[in-house]
Amino acid sequence: MNPLTHAERQALGRHARKQLARSAHADFKRDICPADPLALLAESMRGRVARLVPVKYQRMASSPFGFFRGAVPIMAADLACHPNTGLMTQLCGDAHVENLGAYAALDNRIVFDLNDFDETIRGPFEWDIKRLATSLILAGREAGIRKVDREEAVATFIRRYRRSMRRFSNMPVLELARYQIHRLAHIGPMPAIFGQAERSTPLRLLEKLTEPVDGSAAKPVAKKIAAKKVAAKRAVGSSAREAEHIGAQPRRFRSLPPLLERVTGADARKVLAALDQYAKTLQPERQHFLAQYTPVDVAFKVVGTGSVGLRDFVVYLEGHARPAHSDPLFLQIKEEPASAYARYLPDGAAAWTHQGHRVMDGQRAMQLTSDPFLGYTTIDNRDYLVRQLNDHKAGLNLGTLVAANLHGYADLCGELLARGHARAGDSVSISAYLGSGPRFDEATLGFAHAYANKTEADWDALRRWLKRNPKAAAS
């Protein structure tokens, strides 16, 4: 229960301006952040699978935005050595333009929201804003979008965040808890994202990741069905057609090293045994659904950029439909170290005894609708998050990004991030701090430019280091 009145919460937000003026958010002083970025990066690699560390370096060296995606430990240190507002909420922790995406809700709707919470933790609300704003600059540069359009996208994002937070601060609690954004289908790149999500069925993932047990080539899936037809028939018709084309033979994971490798023997038994503990973290009715699936095979998978080198297993399960593989479920069992922000926050490192539990709770707090199979488990004293690998998931394609789409997408990012922060924090205090004018917006735009430039310098330093140490990127 919140013991403060609405007026007291507003006063708390206004008082925070004395601790950190809104105009001060423009400051990024590299000289007061003594940590060596590459040393922080190397430290974050400790405990990871050594043979995969070069893969992470390769992905980070591909572009400044690729570097940014894998450099949360660096940005966490840089944010922490500057003053903050002290207005805490649940952070996404890795808020950037590719960490929002579409996925299937339990009621079969395709929804769109923040969707990566490996770094989630309670922290100053502005840290998420600064990271996402910087990502808009870097993504815009990578897509070849003009500076004026990049700046307008960042301004649009922050303005929408501020105005949405003001709206949420005056909204009844249950209305906020249920708040949905209904204009999604008409925003910038969203039609393409939703079309991709409709096509990204479990059966298509089955064909991509598995093969018949005898090793013969799988029959190709029929031509892609138009998005509208898939939307109308996804529950019955399209699934039946896809299953028919895949065939009736038993299946197992393909071997595509180092990105996908089958796990067998004692190692596979450890992973499967961990599903029992995981099941206890699900709600009772979802435990019932899970119990109707039978594990078939286990693999080790490399995903993303920031997570490369962490232990990441995939379990292929089959349901009761016939043939059994026409009812696949893929569970990702993903190692979760402590959040990169934890060391810089009061009690951050001690707040959670299980890092998978931390991620699950942070995700549920910020999302309107979460993966119905979201849970956690432990393998060999390491903490893991469990979720569906891909159930109608889709996201932004930087290769097709244009200025008009970036503006609309930035606007959506602002509203979704504000909703997540309002659900898990004090919207009244945050809104009172931000105020009704553009002072915070303009300052944060300045920060985003400065930090994007700093990221490019760090990226260049990584590339030069890899040239001097070619074995570090030799996978």
What are these regions (language model features)?
Residues 197-224, 228, 232-307, 316:
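Acidic catalytic cores of enzymes that act on phosphate-bearing nucleotides/polynucleotides
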Residues 4-92, 97-201, 225-231, 278-475:
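Conserved ATP-binding subdomain of kinase catalytic cores across diverse folds
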